[in-house]
Amino acid sequence: MKKSVCFTFGFLIFSASFSFAQLDKLKKTVGDKIKSVKTPSSGELSEEDVSAGLKEALTMGIEKGVNQLSKPNGYFGDLEIKIPLPKDAANVETKLRSLGQGQKVDEAIESLNRAAEDAANGAKDIFVDAIKNMTVVDAMSILRGEDNGATKYLEKSTRAALFEKFKPVVKSSLDKVGATKNWNTIFTAYNKIPMVEKVNPNLEEYATNKAIDGLFIQIAKEELSIRKNSAARVTDLLKKVFG
């Protein structure tokens, strides 16, 4: 009887030890699995895969964005990104139109947008280089986050550098299409009006910022399309990362 009890007790101890060992093994296996992200089509994704996929989506966005915005009416014909006069020049537009000089205002606004369309052609290499050189911190979080998360990350991390590189391109386009001349015409006309506060916004800075705004809007649209529309995932990497 004592032998039977001892045997039973020993067996229980062995079973418990075996079970704990199996449990530890199971926990390790599960832990290894949850360190990676899974998608229906790709299996496991590494941080490097996700980073490369986000960069590819952004590169595609700028390529399509440049193609769209550099067309005639790319800026001027799109109400979402059409460049108006600066907010601090609202009184200029209102006053000049009331004095019958609306055509000068219209010409200034149109030439401002034509300059942005012309400058867009020179944006591609500048933006693509910024994307390639971008270090994506916490790529997994960006992937799982907002539909424009990669675009917002790009803007936050590269906008200042993009502005400095893109500004000379915009300046050249402003001069090329006559926007600088038209800008000076309306503000000179306004500043000659008696009793008005003189206004003279910085054309190059304003135009560069607004042109960049339009490009980021287009990049965000492409990112959204890639995330939501499987047909937009035209490469193996995009299919792997975005499912």
Where would I find each of the regions flagged by the language model?
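N-terminal Sec/ER secretory leader and immediately downstream segment
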Residues: D24-I109
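Bacterial N-terminal signal peptides that target proteins for export
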Residues: M1-F7
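Second-shell loop/turn segments in exported
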Residues: G43-L54, R97-L99, A108-E117, F127-V128, ...
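An amphipathic alpha-helical core segment
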Residues: K165, V169-K210
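Mid-length scaffold segments of soluble, non-membrane domains
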Residues: Q101-S173
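Bacterial N-terminal signal peptides
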Residues: T8-A16
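A cross-kingdom marker for long, charged
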Residues: T29-K33, E204, A211-G243
